[in-house]
């Protein structure tokens, strides 16, 4: 009868509901024999129900078994159900049922086999929290664990990063009558290596013989791979030699580990030699390279820019059907894109299709990422079109790349349109995508739009995270709303992203408190952003309090947080405070970074502590920290201000020897210093070097011109201004009016007139006041004709519009001693001066007759495409 029921159930495996009805009918029979038969068939029906995922029926089966009066059969049936659950990877159901069985039948000991089965299922399903209870229950039952049991327990502890506890359990094995086998050692060695304790893993390997167990190839490979990951290639080579001494032949896993490590270290040529040897296996007895080996080498060549070698290798992969894979194509695509070979990359996409290896979404996204990072957005849009034609729908990553590209070039409106297109195409944006746009809106000061986006993100359930909150905090700090930012950070600790409701009335109810899952807690970036804002505003006391709060939240400050204080203290000349922070920073194990040194050099420079600057730069060299353009420029600036011009020049030479390209500011300080000495020949030499390196930047010319003018070098200043006019530079930062006035005072009217004629002939619009000294001078000399000509020109210029090349008042501040004593740039001030000048009075009368009483200006000069404007790139 029992066999008949089992057969009937198995016959209806594909119809589980019918099988269940058959089982229930037999079980419900009043006959005790039928009742017992159905219990014996429990494992069969349980397997059918589990496979069909009939969870309600499984629970009903459990209740039916518990209601049975046949105790012995009832227990075995319950345990069989537990066993089936465990074997079917349903530990969440097996474990509570097992606990129930143990509470109902405490005197009956389950088998060690069942415990092992449950432990194995816990590990497979990553439910290690059940492991401890199971082991304790075994001990309470007095069941002796097997070596296999210990192997499972040690593995569970290692997977939970409890390698020390795993070692303690390993050491207990002899006391429990269990001898570790090669699997025990392999599990624990892997645990040590995973925890970064490779040397302890090696110690265990060396101790294996004392336990009567010989190391196998797997354990050696584990150690070799770990040494390789840590960059300890010499140690890995020693292990390979030791393998050979033990009679173990290194296999493909060993060699792939070595090649992978060498490529990661950039030693691709060394890896290539091993690869070449492997290809000659029939002579050297080495394993043949497999697809993993080829891909590792391809990635290595691409990483270091050996594209020709990579291309040759890829061609050999492409021609071999056993090696060619989507992964190989994607590696080659990534290599081409990383080095800007976009045309070749598009060719590879076509080759993939021809080869029958359809490009995946990842393949297209590699191209999208590269194009968008370089701002090649129209090309990126073309790729999106190609994807759609080939039946591949753009995903969140595709749109994210394009969105980031638009935001990077300030095309926020295009990014917003893209977000809408994304939603129309049923591609839901994630928090990362929205955060990109949110950051750009805040950065551009489009706060109301940022608020609207934030509200929509919440409505759509995109999950506001810490990154979102950090963007808002950064935006508020940048817009000077520090107090609001502080309020939000305080709220984040309590309410998570609901703290954004503190932004104002428009945010009330923005986030539902009931949905908070602590996914928006302030992190180091949050605190660092706020610390920077407070220090920038000079609110150091509040910054210190916030720093203490951060540590109270168990967030250990990193060098970035300390550097914020150091930088702002140095900037304010509080060098002692900066060094106190530095001392505390180093006590906490945070090392000085390039940013730290740059801040300290700035602070020491402000305090004119030149000797200490040299000391810091020497320390950087000792620690292998390379100075950058900021380091050199700051040091050069303060060396020049401290009259250490020779030292500053040496630094400039060192900078160029290290292939760090100087910028305008690198030369600015030296030019100013040499003019101050004065040593105009050296200043001229530095200027010429600057032009050859930085190009024809008008900032360099205006600097040199203004310095020559301030030093009274009128002839050299005139020559330079004429060169400037020939190059078509704008004159906004050139003190040309001062030059004209100085020339007139030196009775160099002809030279001054020549400059003005040249400016007029070249179509320059300039301050009409520049004409007044020449008009006055010509009038006094009796040259009325030319004086009247200039006066007419002045009136013509005054009637046109705004002055295009009006002298920048900031440029004048550094040369107050050369200013017109009557002050001001407005030519009307000169017309109103009472110096007896008839020309001035006549010009004034013309203005009163209808030439205009407002701001006097002139026309724009023709715009020249090749102009290289001076950008603040220091």
UniProtKB/Swiss-Prot annotation:
PROSITE patterns the UniProt entry points to: PPR
Family classification: Belongs to the PPR family. P subfamily.
Gene3D superfamilies named in the record: Tetratricopeptide repeat domain
Keyword Repeat: yes
Pfam families attached to this UniProt entry: PPR (PF01535), PPR_1 (PF12854), PPR_2 (PF13041)
The species this protein was found in: Arabidopsis thaliana
Sorted UniProt keywords: Repeat
Protein's UniProt keywords contain Transcription regulation: no
Repeat (PPR) residue spans along the chain: 111-145, 146-180, 181-215, 216-250, 251-285, 290-320, 325-359, 360-394, 395-429, 430-464, 465-499, 523-557, 558-592, 593-627, 628-662, 663-693, 697-731, 732-766, 767-797
Name of the protein described by the UniProt record: Pentatricopeptide repeat-containing protein At2g17140
């Amino acid at each position: 009868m029992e066999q008949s029921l089992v057969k009937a159930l198995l016959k209806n495996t594909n119809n589980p509901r019918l099988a269940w009805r058959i089982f229930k009918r037999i079980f419900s029979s009043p006959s005790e024999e039928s009742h017992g038969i159905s219990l014996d068939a429990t494992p069969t029906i349980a397997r059918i129900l589990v496979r069909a995922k009939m969870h309600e029926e499984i629970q009903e089966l459990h209740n039916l078994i518990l209601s049975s009066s046949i105790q012995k059969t009832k227990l075995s049936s319950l345990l069989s159900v537990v066993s089936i659950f465990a074997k079917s990877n349903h530990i969440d159901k097996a474990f509570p049922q097992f606990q129930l069985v143990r509470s109902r039948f405490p005197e009956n000991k389950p088998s060690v086999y069942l415990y092992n089965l449950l432990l194995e299922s816990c590990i497979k399903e990553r439910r290690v929290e059940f492991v401890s209870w199971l082991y304790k229950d075994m001990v309470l039952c007095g069941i002796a664990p097997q070596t296999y049991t210990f192997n499972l327990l040690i593995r569970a502890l290692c997977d939970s990063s409890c390698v020390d506890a795993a070692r303690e359990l390993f050491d207990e094995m002899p006391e429990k009558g269990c001898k570790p086998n090669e699997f025990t050692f392999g599990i624990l060695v892997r645990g040590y290596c995973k925890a970064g304790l490779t040397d302890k893993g090696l110690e265990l390997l060396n101790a294996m013989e004392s336990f009567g167990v010989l190391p196998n190839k797997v354990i050696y490979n584990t150690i070799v791979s770990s040494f390789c990951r840590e960059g300890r290639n010499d140690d890995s080579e020693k292990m390979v030699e030791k393998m050979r001494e033990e009679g173990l032949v290194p296999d493909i896993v060993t060699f792939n580990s070595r090649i992978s490590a060498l490529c990661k270290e950039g030693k691709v040529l060394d890896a290539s030699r091993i690869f070449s040897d492997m290809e000659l296996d029939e002579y050297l007895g080495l394993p043949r390279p497999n697809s993993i080996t080829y891909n590792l080498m391809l990635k290595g060549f691409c990483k270091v820019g050996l594209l020709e070698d990579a291309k040759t290798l890829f061609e050999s992969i492409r021609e071999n059907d056993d090696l060619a894979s989507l992964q190989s194509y994607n590696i080659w695509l990534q290599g081409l894109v990383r080095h800007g070979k976009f045309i070749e990359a598009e060719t590879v996409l076509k080759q993939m299709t021809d080869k029958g290896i359809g490009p995946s979404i990842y393949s297209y996204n590699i191209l999208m990422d590269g194009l968008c990072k370089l701002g090649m957005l129209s090309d990126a849009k073309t790729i999106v079109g190609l994807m759609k034609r080939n039946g591949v729908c753009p995903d969140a990553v595709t749109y994210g790349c394009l969105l980031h590209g638009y935001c990077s070039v300030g095309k926020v409106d295009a990014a917003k349109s893209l977000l809408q297109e994304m939603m129309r195409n049923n591609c839901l944006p994630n928090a990362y995508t929205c955060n990109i746009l949110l950051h750009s809106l805040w950065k551009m000061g489009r706060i109301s739009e940022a608020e609207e986006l934030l509200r929509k993100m919440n409505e759509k359930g995109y999950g506001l995270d810490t990154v979102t909150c950090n963007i808002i905090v950064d935006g508020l700090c940048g817009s000077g709303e520090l107090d609001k930012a502080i309020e939000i950070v305080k709220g984040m600790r309590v309410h998570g992203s609901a703290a954004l409701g503190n932004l104002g009335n428009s945010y009330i109810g923005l986030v539902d408190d009931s949905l908070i899952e602590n996914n928006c807690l302030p992190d180091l970036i949050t605190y660092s952003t706020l610390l920077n804002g407070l220090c920038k505003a000079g609110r150091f006391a509040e910054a210190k309090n916030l720093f203490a709060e951060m540590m109270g939240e168990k967030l250990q400050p990193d060098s970035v947080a300390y550097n914020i204080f150091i930088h702002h203290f140095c900037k304010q000349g509080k060098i002692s405070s900066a060094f106190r922070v530095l001392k505390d920073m180093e006590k906490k194990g945070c090392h000085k970074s390039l940013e730290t040194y740059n801040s300290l050099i700035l602070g020491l420079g402000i305090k004119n502590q030149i000797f200490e600057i040299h000391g810091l730069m020497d320390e950087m060299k000792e620690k292998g920290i390379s100075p950058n353009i900021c380091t050199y420029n700051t040091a050069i600036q303060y060396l020049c201000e401290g009259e250490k011009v020779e030292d500053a020049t040496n630094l400039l030479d060192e900078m160029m020897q290290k292939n760090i390209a100087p910028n305008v500011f690198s030369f600015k300080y030296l030019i100013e210093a040499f003019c101050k000495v004065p040593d105009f020949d050296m200043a001229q030499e530095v200027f010429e070097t600057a032009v050859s390196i930085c190009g024809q930047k008008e900032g360099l010319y205006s600097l040199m011109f203004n310095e020559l003018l301030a030093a009274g070098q009128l002839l050299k200043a005139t020559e330079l201004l004429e060169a400037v006019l020939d190059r078509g530079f704008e004159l906004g930062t050139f003190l040309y009016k001062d030059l004209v006035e100085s020339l007139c005072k030196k009775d160099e009217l002809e030279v001054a007139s020549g400059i003005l004629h040249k400016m007029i002939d070249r179509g320059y619009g300039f301050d009409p006041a520049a004409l007044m000294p020449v008009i006055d001078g010509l009038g006094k000399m009796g040259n009325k004709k030319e004086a009247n000509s200039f006066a007419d020109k002045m009136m013509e210029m005054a009637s046109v519009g705004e002055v295009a090349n009006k002298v920048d008042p900031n440029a004048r501040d550094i040369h107050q001693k050369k200013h017109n004593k009557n002050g001001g740039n407005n030519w009307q001030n000169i017309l109103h001066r009472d110096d007896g000048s008839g020309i001035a009075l006549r010009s004034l009368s013309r203005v009163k007759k209808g030439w205009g009483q407002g701001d006097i200006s002139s026309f724009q000069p023709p715009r020249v495409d090749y102009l290289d404007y001076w950008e603040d790139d220091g």
